């Protein structure tokens, strides 16, 4: 029964390649949080509040690891805008409940009967989810646990993140032996949630970007010394880099760990000498105060680093090449769920080798696995923020216009479906149910490409977020509905994603109503 529970895969702390804090760094904040996790007389909620790049997720990973080692971790959910389910508020409580049920048999005994009679709990209100999936089983089982929720600001539901905090405020007092550790940027919707009277009184707030700069700089200096020593050893460089250069890199980081980490990734190149790349970093423009003193502002230095990496990778200005760059990098940034290079190539109608070569040239900004079947993701959420802001990404070759790129992705999805979908492409026997086909997954893997799977499940999402000229899209939609609709439903059924068909059609109707409003009647028909 538990395995049939709809939940977010890969959301727990032990999944993925997240790293915890380097030993000896972030000691003040870690000590405060860990003291809180062990004292159940203290507030039941802890909000680690910090700007982008200040290291919230790394700290959350460390807290989860330490809580697990201490036998206190009940469950964890690391939100990510890169994945549909991990960026949805409605998957948080079901996923936490699944983990709690596997850890605590007494919790499982109270949860399973409820799931048997309520299999669609993911579609219910957040209040019902928390009350039935979390609070009641925890209270009845009398469990003591710490629950970690990282990057709440990355949830992108229609309802604001404050909705889940409102639910937490009303119910958390019913489970006094359970603590919630939450991280997130200080965005208005999250700040609003934590200002609710019930939650405000129950929350310990730690503002990460208010830590004394000397403490942060010392931690970044320790990190740089450790990582660059390892890098120098791998590249057989003696006496490199100098202490002065490490100090300058620390200064340029301006308190942002993401700057230091990205710099190390940039220096550790397979195709360039680290010494040469370090010279590039140290020659990046500096800003000065009115008194003429050098100063480094966090976002300015990070933007300068991102832009320099991109400009070093793509030195020639060619409109045709620039279009390919935008298409590939924009796909990495805006896909609903990340794809491997082959899937990106399929949607963009490009050679997969061309995609791999381009992505490899900026791998310091990405999570790019040597295994070509693994999805490509931005290394840090601040990179998509940079690319999609025209005031920050001042080189128009790299600026990603969300609406235009979503339109391009919608066209790519519809084109792939119109070109590739065929009825009974999985060669099912007549009237066979999915459960009758023993090798169903093998047929899906061999006959439905990664790009086609993505297109079938996500075309409507890109369509509703698109902007631009839609005439060509109308013809693609017409072809899809007239000729490929049944084949699309077959694929969704094989992917166990038929719920998505209703959502897709509802979004399509709403989108058509919106874009056709004001058109001549004959045209809109």
Q: Model regions: which residues?
A:
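Conserved NB-ARC/NACHT P-loop NTPase core of NLR-like innate immune receptors
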Residues: 1-410, 425-427, 437-446, 477-482, ...
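Extended alpha-helical scaffolding segments used for macromolecular assembly and cargo binding
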Residues: 412-481, 487
